[in-house]
Amino acid sequence: MKITRRDFVKTGAIAGSGLLLNQISPINIFSGSKLSNGPIVVSTWSPNLKSNARAMEVLLQGKNSLDAVEEGIIITEADPNDSSVGYGGLPDADGKVTLDSSIMDWKGNAGSVAFIEDIMHPISVARLVMEKTKHVMLAGDGAKKFALQNGFKEENLLTENAKNAWLKWKENQVKKENHDTIGMLAIDKMNNLSGGVSTSGLAFKLHGRVGDSPIIGAALFADNEIGGAVSTGNGEYVMRTLGSFLIVEKMRGGLSPQKACEFAINRLYKSLKDFTDINVSYLAISKSGEVGAYSLKGGFTYCFTTPIENKVVTSDFLMK
């Protein structure tokens, strides 16, 4: 069977869930994949298969999509080998690991944290902001104080590998492209949709820089009547176009998730004059389980998980 770059490239097994996934026909991301029933999880980037596996395990236990998103993203946040999220994330120009995260549930509630330090799981803090305060976002020292008051512990998130990369960067100031946010969307057995995003942001960014990840409507937007979208890449350009919100609204207007992602990338493309060191990618899902993904440049992959499969799909892109 011929597998094109538009189709699935890998099939894995759900780790830790006790389920051995069968390889089945690949998903064609251009015509979409529709599910009549059952839970589904999608997330940005191939290394996050393990996060999808955990999220699906949570859904199969009967928990809701918000629980699944949080527990799935926690896996990536705690991975010291992931240099763009949580523990092990590359620091800013001052050697500080600062994190951004956001979360939305099927009721339209949202919470986020920005520029938070020393807390390993910002996705969980973002959820508490949503559930325990009247606010949507907390930032910096205030976000950290809130986390500590709610039982989170202060931890050093700078690993030796990340520290060495920062020291090497300080010597020669060579730009390192590293902005691979995890964005996850999940639909549970009750057909309720939630989403979440977590990142350590651009490697060696200016101290104080905040990207799109904690901005509702930029890196994340979910509407339980329509679907949801997440972004990854250079957040400055996502913020300028509110890409995830735009995608969901285009879906509301009748576009498929795939066509809506393409629309958002084309709008971004038209606004740019210099494409050097810039890439943005979007991932979207409708309430029927149809998935779409599109990127400005090549290389973007996403994870697609149901109760019977856990696989990586390669996205199409604009700038061939």
Model segments located where?
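C-terminal segment of classical bacterial N-terminal signal peptides
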Residues: 22-26
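Alpha/propeptide regions of enzymes that mature by internal proteolysis
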Residues: 2-4, 10-13, 18, 29-320
